[in-house]
């Protein structure tokens, strides 16, 4: 199973159209089964194309480019989390070419109003892969020290969302640096999660942010903020950082993380 997670920093990047094209071409080349995206923005003022989606939605534009180039078409699932930079619907998304049985958007945070950046929507999908049902979650988590939120309670809400015995895969930006804050990282794993990076046979440094970014303004050092966690130990063939300037051009303030595993 081939997975990709990427915080796309949508419409906050220079040369955004070119960067969308790079991501689309990479999806076509790699043939990921499930792609989790965060900070998938659309202008609040943009014309609507459906009940939730605007015509400039990053996910919509990415999907259209991908599906022009593949035989096995992808579907987009998107949900709004909160208002970003006073002008965007900032959402989370999945692209997948697998059969989808259930779509489950929900807030993992105590804050649940769009006008609060602490409001954190999670998007859950129940997918079928090689005859097995898998629960996948696209996550953009509050910081460990977020005032008014308990990060571990937020993540526990995701882990306990479904009582099924399905494999659960939590993918995304967890705003926790395993390098400089190992205790917060260990606390997340103590919720019953396995880090695919640690289990991978082949891996690189795992660094997904290498400069100071929003939320990490005083932290210019290299960071591992993006993860693919599993609630069951599986054979992970590889964990590779992508869109980092070495493995594909940079397309966001975060690098992507691609993981291949055997179910």
Descriptions of predicted regions:
Residues 1-34, 74-263:
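Active-site regions of metal-assisted phosphoester/phosphodiester hydrolases
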Residues 6, 38-41:
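Short loop/turn segments at strand-loop or loop-helix junctions that form parts
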